[in-house]
From Swiss-Prot:
GO terms for molecular function: translation release factor activity, codon specific. Belongs to the prokaryotic/mitochondrial release factor family. The modification N5-methylglutamine is found at residue 233. NCBIfam families: prfA, PRK00591.1. Peptide chain release factor 1 directs the termination of translation in response to the peptide chain termination codons UAG and UAA. It comes from Lysinibacillus sphaericus (strain C3-41). This is Peptide chain release factor 1. The gene is prfA. The lineage of its organism: Bacteria, Bacillati, Bacillota, Bacilli, Bacillales.
Amino acid sequence: MFDRLQAVEDRYERLTELLSDPDIVNDSKKLREYSKEQSDIQETVDTYREYKNVKEQLVDTREMLDSEKDPDMHEMVKEEFNLLKAQQEELEERLRILLIPKDPNDNKNVIMEIRGAAGGDEANIFAGDLFRMYSRYAETQGWKIDIMEATPNPMGGYKEVIFMINGQGAYSKFKFENGAHRVQRVPATESQGRIHTSTATVACLPEVEEVDVEIHEKDIRVDTFASSGAGGQSVNTTMSAVRMTHLPTGVVVSMQDERSQIKNREKAMKILRARVADMYMQEAQKEIDATRKSAVGSGDRSERIRTYNYPQNRVTDHRIGLTIQKLDQIVEGRLDEIIDTLILEEQASKLERLNDDL
């Protein structure tokens, strides 16, 4: 572990030199890249330096303890030694956690896609409930919600809703929502009082900047068409709707939320970039983690991750076996207990892997 920490500190010092180099200062791309890299390891380096300082103090205090003859002074030095020892152990644990590989996307905004799946109208109504739940949670975090595309369901909810949540660390909180969500309840239209089971799928993609993934203009086909409203009737004859196809991957995005074709192009490009990056990332992750399973599931869109049982006021996250009898609070956006537990489980899993590698 300490060889790895020393390598991190050496890299930090090298980055400090690079960031003072006039050639780097005048290269905005490299300057941004190196500044971010240094910022990402700043806390690890600071903690490691504090650890080394405490370790030196321990050596000095140990020598004093061995040589001190006066009983009162010996007791004082012993107390100081014990405090430093406890501090050293605490810093060691912090360093282990800081060495856990970080998701480079954690600080990004998140693009979320919710779709009604099995269950017809009830599935679409549930998709609307999930959108409301996530919106409420985002509001408690002080994050902004921007609906990018929505297809309302005549009976309520959404057949599909795509939205962005803008806020520092939004992706780190929502990334565990990837997968199929199941609801068990009596629909409003059910006259016999029978419980129905329906599902909705959730996809969470980090917002991707142009510098993060390169998409060439020649690889995109853009088609324009008139926007359509409920029932398919034309509501806009200015051909403002846009369909973008990324030819190498076959990823398609349609956007007609805005009256302006330019704005629809901008929104479509954001989603396209995120989906293409996600596809590449998923492929790479499959190769890297072919023999490893995540503590909180695979992240596959089809994986059933959670059940919302209304009659029993129960929510169960199947990935970690967590059951909470607070469905009424959770659907109002009080997701902290679930999200925090998932984050801790993922950290514990990564820490276990790290300990195996050290």
